Amino acid sequence: MKIRPLHDRIVVRRKEEETATAGGIILPGAAAEKPNQGVVISVGTGRILDNGSVQALAVNEGDVVVFGKYSGQNTIDIDGEELLILNESDIYGVLEA
């Protein structure tokens, strides 16, 4: 099943949680923080401006994005996978290789 977000919403798959620190200490599930990065799965058509025109989004499918620690409170389960639904304004930037 696929989801097509509306307007300026973006569907993101959160990156995997880190289970160990850089020093090799294994973290229990409750101690590990959820990552604030993810891969864009799907994007809406764009933000509707006051004059009725549509402004395209600045992110594309496949982009790796950084979002706020408390962003992504809206989640949806698709085929057993938890996906985040974010507004474009929740995204801080796009990581480039």
Curated annotation (Swiss-Prot):
It comes from the Bacteria. InterPro entries: Chaperonin_GroES (IPR020818), Chaperonin_GroES_sf (IPR037124), Chaprnonin_Cpn10_CS (IPR018369), GroES-like_sf (IPR011032). Its main location: cytoplasm. SUPFAM superfamilies: GroES-like. Coiled coil: none annotated. GO terms for cellular component: cytoplasm. The keyword Chaperone applies. It is found in: Cytoplasm. GO terms for biological process: chaperone cofactor-dependent protein refolding. GO terms for molecular function: ATP binding; metal ion binding; protein folding chaperone; protein-folding chaperone binding; unfolded protein binding. SMART domains: Cpn10. Keywords: Chaperone, Cytoplasm. Together with the chaperonin GroEL, plays an essential role in assisting protein folding. The GroEL-GroES system forms a nano-cage that allows encapsulation of the non-native substrate proteins and provides a physical environment optimized to promote and accelerate protein folding. GroES binds to the apical surface of the GroEL ring, thereby capping the opening of the GroEL channel. Belongs to the GroES chaperonin family. Heptamer of 7 subunits arranged in a ring. Interacts with the chaperonin GroEL. This is Co-chaperonin GroES.
